[in-house]
Amino acid sequence: VSAYGGMLALRLASSLIMTRLLAPEAFGLIALVTTISVIAALLSDVGIREAVVHSDHGDDPRLLNTAWTMQIVRGLLIWLACCLVAIALFTARKIGWLVGDSLYASALLPPLLVLGTLSSVVTGFESTKRYTADRRIEQKRVVLIEISSMFIGIVSMIVIARLTSSVWSIVAGGFVTSVCSVVAGHVWLHGAPNRLQWDAMYARQIFRYGKWILASSLMYVLAVQGDKLLLGGWVTPAILGVYAIGQNLAQILEQAIGRVFTQVTAPAFSDVLRNSPQRMREVYLRLRLPFDLIFITSAGFLFAIGPWLVGLMYDPRYAQAGTVLQILSCALLFSRYGVSTSAYLALQAPHAQAFLNMARLLSFYSLVPLSYHLFGVQGAYWAIAVHAAGIMPVAWYYDRRFGLFSWRHEALSLGAWPVGWLVGSALVAAATTLAQGIR
């Protein structure tokens, strides 16, 4: 957890420095490039990592090498898909289909897509030793590699931004991070080296496990990444850049804690199901409790301090990011159901994850456009924040079906929100009083 805290601190520091070196428009462009790249990645997600982690043959070199080969092909396909999108955008702009101030009409977007997503080819060569470490819950070296790679990439990005004041500095930093991470994984992690190999039996096993992962990823990515897709057509690059800063602050904690529960809960659930399946409910509720409390308390805390925090950290160009942070903090109330997803995958029920994401997708595309047309951009922000409430009835249904549900747990954990809000409000009041006293 402390290591992921270090990664969180690095992201915050880089955000603070880069917003002083680049204009808001740069962050809007990169936000959309990242969104398209993530969509392409998740649309080709056949659950390679999950299949290896949960397989009874997860240490078999034939399975690992087959997974590595599939991963390389997938990385190339992601990049080619993004190149096709770039060509389509360039052509649409040339013939006059994309005009005005919308982000899609930017002349920089196509080349940024081509070069900005090249790192997906690099990460395709990532060692499957990472999967073995996940399976054995041996995370120390993996986390150190991630922190070191991120640090080197951030330093590279800042140096290039300082010299050029260009959005390309962000692209270069991401590429350096990917190269460092892949090389270090092959060199420093324990395990046999990978080689190109294709075992038809294991390939079928991965595809069979991953068909529901793929369906789930399709729905998940269209919902979770849909905010920038929609906003990109509604607002200017500068407004989307400010939104991206606020969203980044709201998601830093979610992603850091999300990484912890992905790395910890999946192997833990698989282990208990292999050795003591009767303890699954006990382990599930015990693992959910700390994550629920962290997410819900953080939601209340960020809601209280959002505008004050952004005003403290960023220059006036990004002031509206404080309102974005305050609104999007509400999304943390629903992030806790990621633990449920890990449990369903361990129970060999990836279809449950697919139905969860179907509910998320339907909720998103019914609420967000309607809220935008009724209440403007602010209404869209609120809909983006709370649309995930649509997954709750589905999660409760599957929890009951698998014998994991507890009304008491669901109700009592919500009491953490006012605690977080009170702490945040007290912090803002104390800081304001102190600042006035100093003046």
Predicted stretch roles:
Residues 1-47, 79, 83-94, 115, ...:
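Signature of the first transmembrane helix
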Residues 1-11, 33, 42-96, 107-117, ...:
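Membrane-water interface segments that mark the loop-to-transmembrane alpha-helix transition
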Residues 7-11, 15, 33-37, 41-51, ...:
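Short runs within selected transmembrane alpha-helices of multi-pass transporters and secretion channels
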Residues 9, 14-41, 61, 110-111, ...:
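Interfacial/gating helices of multi-pass transporter permease domains
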Residues 12, 69-100, 110-115, 155-159, ...:
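Alpha-helical transmembrane segments of multi-pass membrane transport and lipid-handling proteins
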Residues 44-65, 134-135, 246, 250-288, ...:
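Helix-loop junctions and terminal segments of transmembrane helices
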Residues 88, 111, 359-363, 374-375, ...:
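Transmembrane alpha-helical segments of multi-pass transport proteins
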Residues 98-102, 183-224, 264-282, 401-417:
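Interhelical loop/hinge segments that connect adjacent transmembrane helices in multipass membrane
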